[in-house]
């Protein structure tokens, strides 16, 4: 902040005609300010672009695709029986000559054995892996919805900090204009301008430094937080979108871009939906339902462990004719094996009970998750309603009132019926109201993003 010198006051009676020239100077400064604040074309990152980049480069989504392929392969593999076993042996070979035709029991034996699955274990294992593959698809839906919410919230923080700097620039410009106007009145001896008037405006200008530091800190932190979703820092040339008015929409449509819903339609969906009912179909809740299905298959697999496992085998034994030429018949053997899982019944019952308890716990988790989502939805709906009321109040009343107050205080000071402190406060109040409206717009957009996270995936479930 540059220093401003305060000249000595000259004779007032000699400078009455300068009052008009001071007013013209103020108009000239305002015109220069407007010309200097034309929009400059820059590379901006819109919310829609940020969302697309975050989803495109998210490693977890790519990992879920690989995990889904893995579970589909596991499902196919689990449908097959165990590999058959082939055996070959020479049996009953005499040790006194090792002749193959010496003893009638000597034979070359080839066998084949096939073990069957235990009950329907393979069927339930296949179903389990199929459900786990479906779980990866739903988990990707949750991740996309979560990414959209988090990226939107971070992007809004970035936009708020950027636009707040714009408001601070506007506040600085107003105070600078007021300083020039007051300085001109004082130096030319117009009206009752005093040295204290200039000092008051200078003090207000100096106090902006702290606000600038805070705003730039918020902007840099939000920018750094946003870059983590892209896997690389944002280029310095990339900036947040700026508008000429804080009342412009903050890309709310981008929050709803995948739903084919307008903002009014989305608000109607929220208003007419019963959260505790509709949010049962939210992907977060569906994940727990799918987990319950997985645990149900684990219960079935545990029950199949109580059944016997069978194995069948067949063998062929070749015998060479006797040394005296007598013919010897070959041997064919058939057999069956079965285990007896009846001696560890207590362990098996405990395994079934554990699997069943885990399934019941998953069902409870589902109900808790639905309650949590529904309660959060109710809070967000109430917050959105209050923010909409505040937004309407600011736009229809406070903005205009503060503008009129600022003009009235400046007129009063110009005619020597007002105080410079009132002029400064009125101008600061005008910018403060605009900043408050910006905060409301940002918070309203954040609330809509959180509601979109809850309702849009559920809406897509019903209208697929």
Predicted feature descriptions by range:
Residues 51, 182, 275, 408-409:
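Generic hydrophobic alpha-helical segments
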Residues 2-3, 17, 40-41, 226, ...:
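Acidic, low-complexity, intrinsically disordered peripheral segments
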Residues 22-36:
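Bacterial N-terminal signal peptides
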Residues 63-78, 143, 147-168, 201, ...:
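Amphipathic alpha-helical coiled-coil segments
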Residues 110-114, 118-135, 140:
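A broadly used, surface-exposed interaction patch
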Residues 51-118, 232, 276-345, 350, ...:
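A small-residue-enriched
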Residues 36, 40-44:
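Boundary at the C-terminal end of the N-terminal hydrophobic targeting segment
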Residues 3, 8, 12, 16, ...:
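Periplasmic alpha-helical coiled-coil/stalk elements that build and connect Gram-negative outer-membrane
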